[in-house]
Amino acid sequence: MPRERQKRGRRAEAKRKRDDEVGDRTAPKRQKASEGDNDFNPLHSQAKIGDDYIPLEEEPASSMDTPFYGLLDPDEQEYFSHASGLLELNQFETEEEKSIFIERVYEEADGKELKIACSQSCSRLMEKLISASTVSQIKSLFNKFVGQFLNLVQHRFASHCCESLFLRAAPYVTLEMKKKSAEKNDNEGEDSSANLRLEDLFLAVLSELEGNWGYLLTERFASHTIRVLLLILAGEQLDNPSKATVIASRKKENLDKPKVTQRDKSASDRRAVPPSFNAALEKMMNDLVTGLDNTYLRALATHPVGNPVLQVLLSVELTHLGKSKARDPDSVFRRLVPDENLEEGSESAAFIKGLFYDPVGSRLLETMVQLAPGKFFKTFYKALVQERIGSLSRNEIAGHVVARILERLSKEDLKSSMDLILPEVLSLVKRSRFTVIKTLIERGVIRGVDLRPLADSLLLAFGTDPIARINNVLKLHHLNEENDDTKRSSKNSTPEQLHGSLLAQTMLKAPGPLSELIQSSLLAVTLETLIAIAKDPVASHVLQDALTLPTSTIQFRRQITSRFSGKMAELALDSSGSHVVDAVWSATENLIFIKQRFAEELLANERPLRDSFVGRAVWKNWSMDLYKRRRGHWIAVAKGLESVNPSNSENRQPPKSNLDLARARFAEKSNTSTPKKITATF
């Protein structure tokens, strides 16, 4: 092993010398590459390159400048890898046992934190430790990293540890604000790291990174950390699923799943943050873009690394700094779109039109459409979208922006936009591009727009034959081919099948002809196809919604549920079909005879159901133990008159009739009426 490290060192040293020798020749080549950009060629050549101006193609400085914190020896690697496996299994009997184990791992890692964070095999352990650490352990680890954050956030593995540390520490900053006086008395006998405030530690990180924002903005690892810091300073709810793609890339494994329930849940959308965070946020945002000219800032819109940071900057600016900030000529929003009128041929109009069709830039445009002030959105819609919304919806990339635009339209504008999109429905269906159609249905239901013209267009596009129609929507021909081979999973489904299932679910939520298109198709398919749909992890959601949504009439539920007779046990033993069986319970609330017949079928297959994990879940959800022992009570539960728990059902009363409700209203009215005053005579 020492010999191998020696060889790597010699090769790296030789490479560094070669880079130094040809350094003068590489700079013009990079300048030439940046000048070759067709969009920004003239302005790039005129720009004065300063410390914060970094060409998009430029690589970071030599890796020899990055400090080396050392390697773990084989025994240490084995120990920490074993500890990582135990944390992954999470088979501790009590939380106290787990806390003791984590404390022992921290003791073993004392002095080796930087080595572990930079280790390919052990950095995951650090992330898992952070996700289960107490506030004192978080402060101690934070203190160990202080002074090294500039290098850690640029490291391939340590950057993930920094993100986990920041995300874990953010809720405790809010708690510290509420317990300032209490902590002063409680921490008198603790070590110095416990006396540190997380607020001060976060500010120390910002001061350490200050002066390097221009480079870190497009650094592929540090850019994630910048996004996290911006959201923390702004007080965003970090466990919000909508922030998941903003915080981390799609390739990052979701190691934080168990800690979502541990975080402090707040009823409001924003966390309370100290006043120092607000000042630090404004300073950080100014420093990020101060050294960048407008040309470079717009180039970030199509940069795969800089674009997500620009999205966060824009969203924080428009949501936390006030809508008036958008009128500031020095704001990020106005520097991207300086023209208010967006006239044809203007610089801003050309920039926005280019974002429509760019796979990276369109995401920034979606953010602008969602958060822009109403005055700008109206100008933007009338000048660049209103007449072109039909052609824009045809494009695979621009269609996502159109969906965001439809979410902000009024009823009249939505109706006129639908009229322009209807001629494109046939081509959209052929290409399985359902995003615009799905959003049009959702917004039409909310705004109260008549969706019958859209239903007619979908009927022509998918076919008048109900069986062929459901095949075209859910791509059932792929389903039938794979049904005879291996067991399918949602990961094996194609994007066309997923989008088709989502479209069908959206259609079922719309009352009237749209939901009837799917319901009639489900009734027309053969029993084998219906069971295949129920067992498919993607298509089964359509069947579940068809059984439970308010748009399904009692006649439809009676017809569709009766088709499952003789197949309930088979579905209950399937991972996807078991959810359909649970939906049948809700669908047959007013169909007690059908529900009893299905319960008898499940009772006849008690042993296989109890031996299966999903079968036991169905057995419990159908209250089959109650069905075996107290049939009368089960019938009351099946009708919704009583709960499964007898203690809760004692106070439960049957629903009142219309006559009882009228009597109650009359009695309430009599009690609230003011009595007549009777004057006493003496």
From Swiss-Prot:
The record's listing under Gene3D superfamilies reads: Leucine-rich Repeat Variant
Q: Where is the composition biased (Basic residues)?
A: 1-15
For molecular function, the Gene Ontology terms on record are: RNA binding
Alphabetical UniProt keywords: Nucleus, Repeat, Ribosome biogenesis, rRNA processing
Q: What is this protein called?
A: Nucleolar protein 9
Gene responsible for this protein: NOP9
UniProt record, GO biological process:
endonucleolytic cleavage in 5'-ETS of tricistronic rRNA transcript (SSU-rRNA, 5.8S rRNA, LSU-rRNA); endonucleolytic cleavage in ITS1 to separate SSU-rRNA from 5.8S rRNA and LSU-rRNA from tricistronic rRNA transcript (SSU-rRNA, 5.8S rRNA, LSU-rRNA); endonucleolytic cleavage to generate mature 5'-end of SSU-rRNA from (SSU-rRNA, 5.8S rRNA, LSU-rRNA); ribosomal small subunit export from nucleus
Q: Cite a GO CC annotation.
A: preribosome, small subunit precursor
Region feature Disordered, mapped onto this chain: 1-46, 249-272
The family database entries (InterPro entries) matched by this protein are listed as: ARM-like, ARM-type_fold, NOP9, Pumilio_RNA-bd_rpt
Query: Where primarily located?
Result: nucleus
Q: Which family does it belong to?
A: Belongs to the NOP9 family.
Name the job this protein performs. RNA-binding nucleolar protein required for pre-rRNA processing. Involved in production of 18S rRNA and assembly of small ribosomal subunit.
Organism for this UniProt entry: Ajellomyces dermatitidis (strain ER-3 / ATCC MYA-2586)
